[in-house]
Amino acid sequence: MKFCNPFLRLILRRKPISMISPTMFLLSSPTTSSSIGHSNGMLRSRSEDNLNKLGECMDNMDEDVSKLFIEFQQTDLREDPDLFRLLNHYFTTSKGVSQLCESLRTCLERSENNECLLLDEALVDFELEKLGYGGSLEEASFRKTYRDLRNFNAFYNNNSGEEDDLDYCEFLRKFQTCHEELAKMVVKLEKTMKDIDKKLRRVRGRRAIVTAALLAPVIAVIFLSKLVAGLVPIEGLSTFVASRWRKSTESLKREKTAMSSMERGIIVALKQVEKISKLVSRLESVERSISLTAEFAVKKRSSVVVAMREVEEERKRLKSTLVDLDRETGLCNGFAQFGRTVALEKITEFLSRGDKSSK
């Protein structure tokens, strides 16, 4: 609410914006009272109510959409609720991808600082204990190695019930939500693009029909009288018609460009999220394999050497997967931010042209 206060008084002076969403229907201008003594108090009270309600609505908007909403007061953004909701959904979904990446980075740091550290300790203790008995594996007890492996298994198995695993649960929740919203956004943008194409085809068809309808009577008169032909501004009439249809066509093309930039950004983000999903599955598989190997080594102590070799190989796979996940997370976040930047530029261009033409 505090964030919106500098702009709200300016907005309330503009034309009504109750078409944006159902919550804004309450923002109607206050009716005057017949009682002069109470009119000032009533107007002040209703203005404050409107200000609070508008502030609550602005709080539910995405930050970028709020800026567009404030800046371009003479455009379709205020009078087209579908466009407003589409922009709000787009920026919210795209920023959800960045939040997903932040959540995943937290999980990766936890895995690096806990699981990898426990495995490194087990491998180091194994080598030290093996050397401590002069390489004689039969005499080595590997007490520290078994302890480290038990610690790893305890962390891995009990982690689902501890507070540390809340980070991973939060990541899974955000991942499911993010993936669903991206898929919905792709469908919405595809439908919007098809609607714009239909409008463009209708505009071109109407242009031909209207031009013919306007010029047909003039041409008929020309055939009847050469004198009238010299007085009728045929070229000016056709130029006027062409300019009006050209403005409509250019506006639709700018809108299509803005929607296209949003669609490309969402598709790239969706592909990156799916890549991350595959890498997360691979990470879970590696961790599960290490846990089973460690459990086998603790129970079948005679096979500790073979088990530790497998643990060493799995440790390399774990490290490689973490590196790949970190790289893809950075790319995903970067693509999402870049997509929002490009889309915001195209949307601003589309709205600013509409704002200038309306003035």
From Swiss-Prot:
Any one GO cellular component localisation term in the record: membrane
Annotated transmembrane regions: 214-234
Pfam hit, one: DUF677
Membrane topology: Single-pass membrane protein
Primary subcellular site in the record, as a coarse category: membrane
Organism domain of life: Eukaryota
InterPro entries linked to this entry: DUF677 (IPR007749)
Localization: Membrane
Coiled coil: 179-208
UniProt keyword terms in alphabetical order: Coiled coil, Membrane, Transmembrane, Transmembrane helix
Membership in a protein family: Belongs to the UPF0496 family.
Listed PANTHER family: PTHR31113:SF19, UPF0496 PROTEIN 3-RELATED
Name of the featured protein: UPF0496 protein At3g57100
